[in-house]
Amino acid sequence: MTDRPFAALILAAGKGTRMKSDLHKVLHPIAGKPMLGHLIAAVDRLGAARKLVVTGAGREQVEAFVAPLGVEVATQEPQLGTAHAVQQGEAALADFDGDVLILYGDVPLVPAETIRRMLDRLQGEDAPVAVVLGFRPDDALAYGRILARGDGAIDDMVEYKDATTEQRAIDLCNSGLMAVRGRDLWRLLAQVGNDNAAGEYYLPDIVRIARAEGGRSVVVEAEAWEVAGVNSRAELAAVEAEWQRRRRLAAMADGATLIAPETVWFSHDTMVGRDVVIEPHVVFGPGVTIEDGVAIHGFSHVEGATVRTGAEIGPYARLRPGADIGEGAKIGNFVEVKNGRFGKGAKANHLSYIGDADVGAKANIGAGTITCNYDGFLKYRTVIGEGAFIGSNSALVAPVTIGDGAIVGAGSTVTRDVEADALAVARGKQESRTGWAARFREAMKIKKAARK
């Protein structure tokens, strides 16, 4: 359905004092993306015609974040309640001929599908003025209550502070999220007063005003997790945990095996293929694609990387941005790859740093190999050819190219290109002195005894 255009109006004017942070509350991340970013992504998926954020304290941070996202900004100063906050969008949206969706920047998990249900209900045959998103929490706490009939029609909405004992016994609570016909919203807001316990202008009052005019408002219900809000670090952690729990379930439903799901942490954009096995304590940062049949062993950290079909990562491996691990390749324990490409079947099994490098198919990188890619000012690239073998404890000083099939002897420091199928050995000549160690020990014993 959702035929009429809609504008998303996101409220983000709160001071967020309980977060005790210099970062604006709505910019704190869930799964690596700011909370506000999750909401913008959701309404973008539904094709929002306009997007507007109402902010107050710390607005410069919010403005900087939304500037490249096609989002307009309005300011609420001072903060006089939710109805007053929505009113700050009138100047931008007064001529908008569509519906207005009201969201909260600190309620980041509401799915696009739930938003669609709200907008579709607003276009129902009974033509409601407003659709309110309600939920039934395990503990209603101090949420506002929705007084609704069996068909979802709302008789009244009341803030907890102003509710009677009987009203507080109702378990249908107001999430604050609402969809309103734009042609009615501003007129209704103009009639909202502040004769209540807090002296604020409450958005839910428009439901009562519309009903007095003969208009109808209805409730659509959501699961409690969808409308969980964040006002403290503890609540931020709880919302993160819920997001991760659901993402893990989705990964397993799509054909991945998570040995200990509760220990795997995804980013908002992690892509995981089928028949992937992820062992305990794996962390995915942003920008990761894991193709089919990959094994990621425990305690590995992957960000900004692509791992191709059948590759094996870890344990204790780190893939940094720009890492591209080829089909059937192996990145082993305590190996770090940054901006490095590994060809099909290439291996770096132990204790290596491979940065700004191209590693050819079937190449074998020995333990302790370091690509020396930085001189303190600029980065340089290392190219290792197909089938090359790099001996243990080697340093490859970039820019340098190791040809196809070449062998670098263990312990070498390579500063010049090595041609294909050549052997390069770059280390000091070994010297052995017969009996020297025994003579040294005896001399040192005498010296030590003389000091007593």
From Swiss-Prot:
Pathways per UniProt: Nucleotide-sugar biosynthesis; UDP-N-acetyl-alpha-D-glucosamine biosynthesis; N-acetyl-alpha-D-glucosamine 1-phosphate from alpha-D-glucosamine 6-phosphate (route II): step 2/2; Nucleotide-sugar biosynthesis; UDP-N-acetyl-alpha-D-glucosamine biosynthesis; UDP-N-acetyl-alpha-D-glucosamine from N-acetyl-alpha-D-glucosamine 1-phosphate: step 1/1; Bacterial outer membrane biogenesis; LPS lipid A biosynthesis
Region (Linker): 234-254
Compartment annotation: Cytoplasm
A family per Pfam: Hexapep
Region listing for N-acetyltransferase, in residue ranges: 255-452
Family, as annotated: In the N-terminal section; belongs to the N-acetylglucosamine-1-phosphate uridyltransferase family. In the C-terminal section; belongs to the transferase hexapeptide repeat family.
Protein name, UniProt field: Bifunctional protein GlmU
Source organism (scientific name): Rhizorhabdus wittichii (strain DSM 6014 / CCUG 31198 / JCM 15750 / NBRC 105917 / EY 4224 / RW1) (Sphingomonas wittichii)
Lineage: Bacteria, Pseudomonadati, Pseudomonadota, Alphaproteobacteria, Sphingomonadales
